[in-house]
Amino acid sequence: GDVPEASTLGRFRNQLVEHDLWERLLGEINRQLDAKNIILTEGRINIIDATPVEAAQSGSGKGKDGQPKRDKQAGWHVKEDSRGTLKSTYGYSVHTGVDEDGFIQRQTVTAGNVHDSVERDTLLLGDETALYADAADSSKATRDKLERFGTADQVQRKGYRNKPLSAKNRRRNDAIAVIRAGGERPFATYKSRYGLARTRFMGLAKNMTAYGIAAIAHNLRKGAKFLTLYGLPDPNYAR
């Protein structure tokens, strides 16, 4: 059929923002993919990760219309890169939980200054067989929660200046990193394919919905690719 006009799509997006519907839609898309045995929920793992995205309105002062140039609901994300250099980004953080095939199961968006570990409980499913995460989520609270859920702890360990990681934990972290790499692929899709390395809107609610729509598009595209490559799985062997 005909592609709707941009104004129609904009009004639809605004309705999603107003009624906070993107998460329900993502859940429904995943339910339908699960019903077709494209997403497999039994025995699934959960890979949680986060990425900073720059606020499109990150300058100081006011524009010609008198409105602030800076998105006040964004925040500074500061992280040390692999070379030990601190990198600062004024914007938001997109937090996702994906399965081993790269389908997004949970997602949320926060101001950039919110620590990644704060959203751990938002991303936990409760029925995952294992949780993969980086050292930002390494804590006794995380380990205790995973034990209550009966979930295997695949969270990387932290090293400290006066207590560096043992050789065993370094090897463990390296093994976890191989699986965790799958959790970063949606971010590459968002930034390179969907042009979302920077936000397009002012405010948390609008950006939450924008990245929620991106998550839905990501899962639909991946589901279509699975169908093209493999066809519909035999339900007798899919579970």
Model-derived features: positions:
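Helix-centered, glycine/charged polyanion-binding patches within enzymatic domains
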Residues: 125, 129-130, 135-212
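Generic secondary-structure signature for well-ordered alpha-helical cores
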Residues: 34, 38, 192-195, 222-225
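A general lysine-centric signal
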Residues: 87, 93, 191, 206, ...
